[in-house]
């Protein structure tokens, strides 16, 4: 499915560096580093890994003078590596000072994330918020007004709770919290416009950690503004719980046409790559038919007919192989991200699923003849057997990609002009 065939709420388009965000552009995948930004080498390495995995925007923490002092160098090192991913500065508490004191940082970032709940307190709050917006104006940068229910403006909370208590029909506590989030986002976006920031340089978000609350907040928010919306379930958690929670929330909203950029906020397992959040975000969009990022492998779950684990191992190897190739294939073979591959475990559904894919292999189940027919574009082409089935099948996949997606290939796609492109990689 082309992204334009999905019904989306109409929004302005905001440019984050070379990446457009809004209803006229594809839903954008972004991620965030967990390195100390003051450690430029570690941050460059992780940003590069996230970008190579397919992240189209990467957010970095800018929380100290030491971190701010390294942002310009980080940007230049990434550029030297051929990595043009836009960097977003995540500011809390002291962003007004850091942007003023480190102009190299302010210039190098493609967007500033501002949390209205901790930009300042009391009389200093408006002054410090204004300073950050003026920096965005001076450096011609967009901002994200990012409200989080864990860090709402305490003065605003107290005022709204007092007002609610005096209503004839007070809102329930959860409904009041959702309204606080929405009002904070919209009021601060309006304040940014009053200070002179154009409306097409504003993205907003309202983050919560409960699925149903996120859905309700964004449905309401989406009906009350035309700013692009950043979607994400904050503190989603670890492992399958985090994946399921984010998928449940984001899928409902995306199906409603709400959401212009997404991040899946997973807590990594010890030693786990940060890139998993990028893969999950891509797979949410791809399984919904909204965008394509990498060829996905169809594989049966296995049953009593598939006592061998070989088909599972082959499916895993092929999926990893395809994803590993995508940083190069994405630019070399446009359209390959739409390719489908089937790795099936027995004769029941194997031939049928294999015929429906661009390339499919039907491995023998328990008691079946130990051969594996391969189907290309619905036609049986060869039968594999022996110890080299995996290697031989990989060669068939490589040849199919080369023939069909190279220059002049029948499945090759021309660029979409969205700015979401991959440029040649350098070693790191």
Curated annotation (Swiss-Prot):
GO terms for biological process: isopentenyl diphosphate biosynthetic process, methylerythritol 4-phosphate pathway; terpenoid biosynthetic process. Binds 1 [4Fe-4S] cluster. The keyword Metal-binding applies. Converts 2C-methyl-D-erythritol 2,4-cyclodiphosphate (ME-2,4cPP) into 1-hydroxy-2-methyl-2-(E)-butenyl 4-diphosphate. GO terms for molecular function: 4 iron, 4 sulfur cluster binding; 4-hydroxy-3-methylbut-2-en-1-yl diphosphate synthase activity (ferredoxin); 4-hydroxy-3-methylbut-2-enyl-diphosphate synthase activity (flavodoxin); iron ion binding. It comes from the Bacteria. InterPro entries: Dihydropteroate_synth-like_sf, IspG_bac, IspG_bac-typ, NO2/SO3_Rdtase_4Fe4S_sf. The lineage of its organism: Bacteria, Pseudomonadati, Pseudomonadota, Betaproteobacteria, Nitrosomonadales. SUPFAM superfamilies: Dihydropteroate synthetase-like, Nitrite and sulphite reductase 4Fe-4S domain-like. Keywords: 4Fe-4S, Iron, Iron-sulfur, Isoprene biosynthesis, Metal-binding, Oxidoreductase. This is 4-hydroxy-3-methylbut-2-en-1-yl diphosphate synthase (flavodoxin). The keyword Iron applies.
């Amino acid at each position: 499915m082309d992204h334009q065939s999905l019904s989306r709420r109409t929004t302005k388009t905001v440019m984050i560096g070379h990446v457009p965000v809004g209803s006229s552009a594809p839903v954008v995948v972004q991620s965030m580093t967990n390195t100390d930004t003051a450690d430029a080498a570690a941050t460059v390495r992780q940003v590069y890994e996230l970008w190579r995995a397919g992240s189209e925007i990467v957010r970095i923490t800018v929380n100290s003078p030491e971190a701010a002092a390294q942002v310009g160098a980080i940007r230049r090192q990434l550029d030297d590596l051929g990595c043009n991913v836009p960097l977003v500065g995540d500011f809390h508490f002291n962003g007004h000072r850091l942007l003023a004191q480190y102009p190299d940082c302010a210039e190098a970032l493609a967007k500033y994330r501002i949390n209205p709940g901790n930009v300042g307190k009391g009389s200093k709050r408006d002054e410090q918020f204004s300073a950050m917006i003026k920096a965005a104006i001076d450096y011609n940068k967009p901002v994200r007004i990012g409200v989080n229910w864990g860090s709402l403006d305490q003065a605003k909370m107290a005022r709204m709770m007092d007002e609610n208590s005096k209503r004839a029909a007070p809102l329930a506590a959860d409904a009041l919290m959702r309204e606080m989030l929405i009002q904070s986002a919209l009021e601060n976006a309006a304040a940014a416009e009053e200070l002179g920031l154009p409306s097409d340089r504003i993205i907003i978000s309202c983050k919560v950690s409960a699925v149903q609350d996120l859905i309700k907040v964004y449905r309401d928010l989406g009906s009350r503004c035309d700013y692009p919306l950043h979607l994400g379930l904050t503190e989603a958690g670890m492992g399958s719980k985090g994946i399921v929670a984010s998928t449940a929330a984001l899928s409902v909203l995306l199906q409603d046409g709400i959401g212009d950029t997404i991040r899946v906020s997973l807590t990594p397992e010890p030693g786990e790559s940060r890139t998993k959040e990028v893969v999950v975000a891509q797979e949410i969009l791809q399984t919904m038919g909204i965008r394509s990022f990498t060829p996905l492998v169809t594989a049966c779950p296995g049953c009593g007919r598939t006592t061998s684990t070989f088909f599972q191992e082959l499916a895993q190897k092929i999926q990893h192989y395809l994803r590993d190739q995508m940083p190069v294939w994405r630019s070399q073979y446009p359209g390959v991200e739409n390719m489908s591959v089937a790795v099936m475990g027995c004769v029941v559904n194997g031939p049928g699923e294999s015929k429906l894919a661009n390339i499919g292999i039907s491995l023998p189940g328990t008691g079946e003849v130990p051969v594996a027919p391969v189907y290309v574009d619905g036609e049986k082409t060869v039968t594999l057997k022996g110890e080299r089935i995996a290697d031989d099948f990989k060669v068939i996949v490589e040849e199919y990609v080369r023939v069909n997606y190279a220059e002049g290939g029948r499945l090759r796609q021309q660029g979409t002009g969205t700015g979401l492109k991959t440029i040649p990689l350098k070693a790191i």
